[in-house]
Amino acid sequence: MGGAARLSAPQALVLWAALGAAAHIGPAPDPEDWWSYKENLQGNFVPGPPFWGLVNAAWSLCAVGKRQSPVDVELKRVLYDPFLPPLRLSTGGEKLRGTLYNTGRHVSFLPASRPVVNVSGGPLLYSHRLSELRLLFGARDGAGSEHQINHEGFSAEVQLIHFNQELYGNLSAASRGPNGLAILSLFVNVAGSSNPFLSRLLNRDTITRISYKNDAYFLQDLSLELLFPESFGFITYQGSLSTPPCSETVTWILIDRALNITSLQMHSLRLLSQNPPSQIFQSLSGNGRPLQPLAHRALRGNRDPRHPERRCRGPNYRLHVDGGPHGR
């Protein structure tokens, strides 16, 4: 194919019309921020996933990359790796605090500079520092996660985005270099109970503070270890950012036991707007990239697929927090 992505005829027509219209209405959009999950926002064209790699040369991997994310994980393709160590979380024994944002694309929690939260272990050879917690969700139950397991989606997906602090000084630099990023994904179902960490983020007093784009609310005294199941396995593969520039420098770690939130909490998420209050309401839901080909990439897991009936037992299937296995 060469170095450039080839447009289909419909894509070329849409892009030509959109760029022509943009030339006649107001200032040009910021090329580093001109993207969306939906092509049509209030009658204006904004590049959706099929166009990400076509409108900005720096995003070309979105169109031509061979290690893109998200993917559909077929469990029969997962290779059992008994040498994968448990995941380790370091918080320095302190509670997490930070700011919950409605970015117009995601519900995003940005931790404060202190305490520093690090993850290591599993497939990671380096310590990675937490930079963002991102929540993706759908307009209907069972169709909100980016990744799928055996062709089945989940209602939401929580992504913990980390950068390699041993090799890079920040997330931006790490996203451009090898072994730069690690993203832990936890899947979410709608049920009668709720994960205790997500309950802090999604209770009525909190979630109504970020109803519109650019709204923010400060939270503190959060115990990040409560986000994780008491015991779990994980699947890992090499992939990319699932947003522009789609850099192929991510080690993905998918936790194989889903979390729960209530139907009321999910409804509250769907009432969040991707626009400011001065503009028409458009739900934040449906904020995920479509599946990408897995191709010949390896999927590794720490559970033996030959014995799927066996429960995760022992310290290798627990999150190790500040030096020891976490239990509730």
Curated annotation (Swiss-Prot):
Keywords: Glycoprotein, Secreted, Signal. Residues 319-328 have a biased composition (Basic and acidic residues). GO terms for cellular component: basolateral plasma membrane; extracellular region. Glycans are attached at residue 118. Pfam families: Carb_anhydrase. Residues 33-303 form the Alpha-carbonic anhydrase domain. Residues 1-23 form the signal peptide. One of its GO terms (molecular function) is zinc ion binding. Residues 300-328 are annotated as: Disordered. Its main location: secreted. InterPro entries: Alpha_CARP_X/XI, CA_dom, CA_dom_sf, Carbonic_anhydrase_a-class. It is found in: Secreted. SUPFAM superfamilies: Carbonic anhydrase. Belongs to the alpha-carbonic anhydrase family. Does not have a catalytic activity. This is Carbonic anhydrase-related protein 11. The gene is Ca11.
